[in-house]
Amino acid sequence: MWSHLLVLACALLMLPAQALAGAKEKVAALAPSGLVLAMDEKGNELVVQNADKPFVPASVTKIVTAWLAMEVLGGDYRFETRFYLDGNRVLYIRGGGDPFLISEELAQLASGLVAAIGKKPLSGIVLDASYYPSDIRIPGIEDTDEAYDALNSALAVNFNTIHAVRKGKTVSSAEPQTPITPLAISQFRARGPQGRGRISLTQNPAVGLQYAGELIVAFIERAGGSVKGKISTGAVPKGLEPVYIHRQSHTLSQILAQLLLGSNNYIANQVFLEIGGHRLGGPVSLEKSLQVANEMLAKRGLAESIHLEEGSGISRGNRFTARGLAQLLLF
């Protein structure tokens, strides 16, 4: 039924005005409780049915998140990850909530880092994820292995997921660009399917952080560096200046294009959390981002028609109206 309704709604855009009356009746007969708002290129409403009735928007929420991000951060915005080195060659890594630290990006990151600090062995790695509170939780995220339930983090790689292949007890990477690490092997052996699959890191934020550290170390070694000490967590010492700042190679506009194309919940809420962190200062929080979002929606007269609980649509507490969404798309 819904596919028929979509086709009919699209066809309305090509109808002459005198034919619209009959089309409205067909829409009402096909889906009397459906929400329909068809508009022409000038914003004139052609067919209206339940346009002010709130609905659960699901992944349509990502459109609002993308609009908010462009308004607050700007299309040229780039996420940053900062690196610090103390006198004992302990490397501190401070995550900045980059949603797109995929393996290809880590290869670029490691190359720039090794060029900046040299190839002398590092005596340890300390991961600082304090930009995100350790107890941050997104409404609707559940404790499953599904990629759409991946936890958000100040420092996570490959969308806080592991993509691997399991044959019996043997685990290998499913991607030539991604080295396999000890944590990836143990996690996928315990929770991954036989054959090829992807699991999210949801049980414990420390697990995803450890995986990020292991994968960064693997790429440092690929770039010609080496790490002799262990991976731990902690804060960057006060007064220590960054020796290297990695700026994401993708602009926000490019990341948002990937977000909307793949409907990635993890990216959506990383971006949503940055909206509040950027405008109100870190650490990030859902409350800060909701405050900024609600203020911006209110300024546009959309406070009553767009209600957000998070930025991806995974929460069923989000509520939109068709007219509110249409008005936002016209801005």
Residue ranges and their predicted role:
Residues 56-69:
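Active/ligand-binding-proximal structured segments within catalytic/core domains
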Residues 292, 307-331:
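C-terminal soluble interaction/assembly domains
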Residues 44-47, 302-311:
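Extracellular-facing binding/remodeling surfaces
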Residues 23-25, 71-303:
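Conserved serine DD-peptidase/penicillin-binding transpeptidase domain
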Residues 49-55, 202, 312-315:
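A short glycine/serine-rich beta->alpha loop
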Residues 15-57, 73-79, 112-121:
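Beta-lactamase-like hydrolase cores
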Residues 6-14:
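Bacterial N-terminal signal peptides
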